[in-house]
Amino acid sequence: MEGDLINTNKALLPLSWLYGLGVNFRNMLFEMGILKSRSFDVPVISVGNITVGGTGKTPHVEYLIRLLKDNFKVAVLSRGYKRKTHGFLRADKNSTVRDIGDEPFQMKTKFPDITVAVDGKRTRGITQLTSGDSDSQPDVILLDDAFQHRYVKPGINIMLVDYHHLIIYDRLLPSGRLREPVKSKDRADIVIITKCPTDMKPMEYRVITKAMSLYPYQQLFFSTHVYEPLRPVFPKNAKTLGNFKDMNVLLLSGIASPEQMLIDLQERASQITPLSFSDHHNFSQKDIMHINEVFAGLPSPKVIITTEKDETRLLNTEGLSDEVKRSLYVLPVKVSFMLDQEETFNKHIISYVRKNSRNSILAKGKDDNKSKDSDHSGDRPRTISFRNN
C-alpha cells in the first residue's frame, strides 16, 4: 500500500520528541479547561488536518459550499494565509489576493453569493459574522483549515487525511509531517481519506479502516479528486485547445503537494515539464521571466497547465508573455466520494445544519432536491461500521 512508504528523518527524532511535548502540553490545557474552547449558536463545520502539505482542504470546503448554498446562507471563515492585511476582513467584489489570500479569493470568485471572511482569530471572526441584524447573519459557518484551532469548538469537526501520506505511518515534525500526534484524530467527528485512487481494491478499504482505529462516534469516508475540463486563464486571447495528449505540457504549480497532480496528468499527456514553486508562492518578476523562458524553450505544440489556486495569483501578475497568456489553462478539481458514500455524507451535514440553524423551520425539507442534484452515484449508501481492534 502506498500509504506506508512515507519517508521520515530519524536523525531529527529528538527534536520531534521535544515538539511533541509542547503540542501535548497545549492539548492538555484544552482538555483540562485551562484553555477554553468556545461554542457558538450558529452551526460551525471545521475542515482541516494535522499534517503539513496539501490534503485537499479547499476542494472539500467547496464541496460543502455547493451542498449547502442553495438552502442556507453560507459563510466561509479562513485565516487568509499570506494576505497583506490584518484583523477581520469580509471579502467583497473589490477584494484582491493580497487582501484576503489565494484560497479565500478562489472561493469568493467561484461562489460570489456566499460570505467569505478572513481573520487569524477564529472566535473573533465568528463573532463578527454573527453580529448585526439577523438577515445578514449566516445559517452555517465553514472554518477552513481549523482542525488545530482549538479555541473554537465546532459542531462537526472534519479531519482530512491524504491517502498517499496516511498519518498512522508518519511522525511528528520535524522528522515527519505531523503537526499533532496521531491520537489527535480522536477529536474528529468525520475522517475523510482524500485523493484515493479510483481503482482501490476492497482489501485496501478494509486495511485502512482497521488501521485508522476510529471510535464508534466517528465516521470514515473515502474521497477522490475529479478533474474537470481545462479552461483558459485569459479567455479573451486563448488559443483553441483540443486533445493535449501529444502536446508538450508545462505544469506550473505553487501548491503543497504537486506530485499527485503530476502523476494524474501523466495519464493524459506524454510530455510534461514540471515547474514547481512553494505553497501559496507569490510570483515575482524574476519568477515570471523564468516561466516565460521555460515555456518559450518547449517545442510546439505546447500548453501551460496550472491549478485554480495558482490562477488567483497569476491573473493580475504583470510580465507574462503574450504566448504564455494564450497558452495558460487551469485544471479545476472537484471532490467525489467513493463506496456510494456521498448521500450518507450529504444527509449527515444537511441534517446537522438544519437542526441547528436559526432558520431551521424554513429550511426543513429543502434538502431533498439538493440531494438529487449533488451528482452522487449509486442508489443506496454503503455504511461502514467501526470497531477498535
Segments predicted by a language model, with ranges:
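Phosphate/Mg2+-binding loops and adjacent switch elements
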Residues: 80-218, 222
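Conserved beta-strand elements of the Class I
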Residues: 75-77, 159, 248-252
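A transmembrane-helix-recognition feature enriched in membrane-embedded lipid enzymes
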Residues: 1-41, 352, 356, 360
